[in-house]
């Protein structure tokens, strides 16, 4: 269930990034926030440590996993149920390409 208005447009997109420590992903979060502001996309974007966070009750429209936690994708998908879970590509992660990851989120959510 996405955060969608009656007119069918997104009110605010909630994007969660999960990685091993949360440190490197926090830089990607900042770049994604800047890209969202530049594109006038209302988005709540945050990062958590996938191994130390209970994702059972997370409220997100989409979840992206850093390359270092790809092994946990199936387990995380099972935990979060209907929330779509995607991998951040190695190139986008390595280059901290927030604009590209944001574009992927919008594409996956049909925005």
Feature annotation, model-predicted:
Residues 22-23, 67-70, 91-92:
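Short, surface-exposed acidic/glycine-rich loop or hinge patches that mediate macromolecular interfaces
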Residues 30, 34, 78, 103, ...:
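Short, well-ordered alpha-helices that flank and scaffold nucleotide-derived cofactor binding pockets
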Residues 43-52, 58-59, 65-85, 96-97, ...:
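Cofactor-cradling patches in redox/metallo enzymes
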Residues 14-20, 61-64, 86-89:
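Short glycine-rich or small-residue beta-strand-to-loop segments that form or flank ligand, phosphate
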Residues 1-11:
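Short, Lys/Arg-enriched N-terminal segments with co-localized hydrophobic residues
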Residues 14, 84-111:
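Ser/Thr/Gly-rich flexible loops in soluble cytosolic domains mediating phosphotransfer, phosphorylation
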Residues 13-52:
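Conserved active-site segments centered on acidic
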């Amino acid at each position: 269930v996405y955060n969608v208005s009656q007119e069918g447009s997104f009110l605010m997109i909630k994007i969660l990034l999960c990685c091993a420590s949360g440190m490197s992903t926090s830089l990607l979060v900042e770049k994604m926030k800047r890209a969202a502001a530049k594109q006038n996309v209302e988005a709540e974007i945050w990062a958590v440590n996938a191994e130390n966070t209970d994702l059972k009750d997370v409220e997100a429209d989409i979840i992206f996993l850093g390359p270092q936690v790809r092994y946990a994708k199936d387990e995380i998908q099972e935990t979060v149920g209907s929330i779509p879970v995607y991998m951040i590509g190695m190139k986008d992660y390595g280059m901290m390409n927030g604009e590209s990851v944001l574009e992927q989120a919008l594409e996956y959510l049909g925005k």
